Amino acid sequence: MVVSHEVDDRGLAELRRPRNDLVSEVAVGRDRFTLDHGPFHSWERTLQVDGGRDGTHRVVETITYRTAVAVWRPLFALPLRWAVRARRVPWWAPPDRLDARATRVLCLLACVQVVDGYLGTVITQTITFASDEFGRGDAAQGVTLAVVRLGIVVALGVVALADRRGRRRLLVATALAAVAATALGALSPGLWFLGSTQLLARGLTMGVGILIGVFAAEELPRGSRAYGVSVLALCAALGAGMAVWVLPVADLDPRGWRAVYVVPVVAIPGLVAVGRRLPESLRYTANIGSEQAVLNGNIGGRRKVEGYRLLMLAVASFLLLVFAAPASQFQNDFLKDHRGYSAAGITLFTLLTTTPAASGSSWLAGGPTPVADGVWGPSACWAARCSWWSATTPREPLCGPQQWLARRWAR
C-alpha cells in the first residue's frame, strides 16, 4: 500500500514516529520500520521524503504487510486496509492488540466453530421432515430429541481426555468424528437410527464447542476473551445458518432432508488443514509437568470462588435451556404442521428472527460490561418472563411480520 502525504515539519515528525495503534512498530533506520507486535506475520513501513521550499514536505509512505487471519483474509482485506491507512485502532478490533499467534489461533478456531455450529443444528431443523418420512408423530420426536440430549455424557468424556491428551489433537479428531457420525444419519432406515447417530454426533459436537472455548480462553489476553467468545459465537451462528440455508432441499423430495446431513463432509479437508496449522494451547503446554506444583499450592480459596462461579453459570444455563431447548426443537414442526410453512418458508422465518438476535448478543458479549454480571437475578427473571410469555401469549402477535414475510416470499 502506497500513501502520499503533504505535511509540515510537525506532520513529518509524526510520520517518523513508530506506530502504536493496530500495530506496534520498531525503527530499524531513519525512515524504515518493522513489526514489533500486532496481528501480522510480517510488516514493513518505509518513508521517502522530498523537502519543499515553503516548509512543506511530500512524503511517500509504503507499507507492506501479511496478515495472520488465515482463510478469513478476503473478509478482512478492505477493513484492514482502511485501518492501516487511518493509523488508528478500528472499532471492530479487540480491546487488546493481538499478536500473530493469537490472531491465527482465533481464526482457525473460528473455522472449526462454523462446522460445529452446523453440526449442532441439523437434528432440530430436520426431525420434523424425518418424522414425516418414517410416519412418526410428535411423541416420537420428543423421545428422540430427549435421547439425543444424553450425548452430554460423550461431551464430558471428550473434555476429560483433553486434559490428558492435549487440546489440538483431540479437537480435530473429535470434529472429524462428529462429521462422520452426522453423515451416517443420512442412511437412517428409521427414527431410532437417526436418534442413535445423533446421540453420538451431538455429544461430539458439544465436546468440540467446549474445547474451542477452552482453547480460546487459554490463548487470548485476559481483556479480549469476551471479544473472542463473541467472534466464535458469530461463527457458530453462521454455521447454524448454513444448515438452515440447505433446508429448502426438503421441499424437493420426502427424502431430501438427508442432504443436510451429507453437506458437512465437504468440511473434512478443511478440518485436516486446520489440524496441521493449529498449535497446541500455550497453557496446556506450560502446565505439562507442573501438576504437582499446583496441587501443592495453597489454592483452596481460589477453588471455592471458582466453584461458586461455576454454579452460577450452570444455574443460568439451566434456566435458559428449560425454555430455549423445547422452543428450538419443536419450532419447525409447529411452523410446518400448524402454520403450513414449506421448508423454504421455515428457512426465511428462521433467518429473519435469529440473525438480529445473534448479532446483538455477540455485540453485548464483546462490550465493556461483562454479560455475566448479576447472573442470578437477571437469569431467573428472564427465564421466568420467557416461560410466562410462551405459555400465555399467542405466537402470531410476537412474530407476525416475520411470519407474513416468510409465507409471502417462500411459497
Predicted regions located by residue number:
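Helix-breaking motifs and short loop linkers at transmembrane-helix boundaries and internal kinks
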Residues: G135, G166, L187-F193, L204, ...
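Helix-to-loop junctions at the C-terminal end of transmembrane segments
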Residues: V154-R167, G360-A372
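Extracytoplasmic gate region of multi-pass secondary transporters
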Residues: T121-T128, E306-A358
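Cytoplasmic helix-loop-helix junction between adjacent transmembrane helices
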Residues: T197-L234
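Glycine-rich segments within core transmembrane alpha-helices of 12-TM secondary carriers
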Residues: S224-L252, A267
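Symmetry-related core transmembrane helices of the 12-TM Major Facilitator Superfamily/SLC fold
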Residues: W257-R276
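Structural signature of the two symmetry-related core transmembrane helices
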Residues: R169-L184, G374-W389
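Paired small-residue
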Residues: A181, W192-A201, P397-L405
